[in-house]
Amino acid sequence: MLTIDQYVRAESLEQAYELCQKRNHVVLGGMLWLKMQDRKVGTAIDLCGLGLDRITETERAFELGAMVPLRALETHEGLNAMTQGAFARSVEHIVGVQFRNCATVGGSVFGRFGFSDVLTLLLALDARVVFQGAGEMSLEEFCARPPFRDILIRVIVPKGTEGTVYLSQRNSATDFPVLTCAIARREGAFRFSIGARPGRARVYRDEKGLLAGGITRDSAQAMAEDLSRRVPMGDNLRAGAEYRTKICQVLVRRGLLKLEEVR
């Protein structure tokens, strides 16, 4: 059972940041995972009054507030036009619409869960994150850092992507993914993000120049084989490492060929 001693609706980001520095204080997101935990929370910090539930479009990027629900990513015309529907595909298997109306971008990103579809896609898109204390950094850098206590304010998704694809393999439609794969092309360069390994998503690049001559069936297969050798896989209840390695090769090849179609 989750027990909360004190509830505070933060009046400012400064107040929320100060409160979250204490070890037994917790920031509330959608509370979908938090409520399932057996723990005692000293102070629950609610950010819902700070205007972080908006998606803002600027000349160079889309800015996603930390309290934006995942459902908004699924239905936002601008985000999905820029990514050829990848945002909608990245969340469509996450339980159901009611769940996605509650789950937040901030919870998905700050939690850095291995099974996170959203994190996989945002890494491929070279997103940046902005914190109250630590300031702005790349999402890739944040994922490599050890845990720290801070308030995530927003996620910045830069424009200019020439094509984006998101794919996942699941044992059943609304289950956690066995493997996730996102590919984005920008200025001729490719970013591959592989998640649910079952560890958190990581970014990979075409280090050998296998796609320098463009995407063909042969180059896509070569890139898929290269990545399947480079991405470390593990075992859990949903799949073994060997199976994930085979699935990785399939998803990368399919993703590249699909990326060429939407060019």
Locations of regions flagged by a protein language model:
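C-terminal structural segment of proteins
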Residues: M1-R263
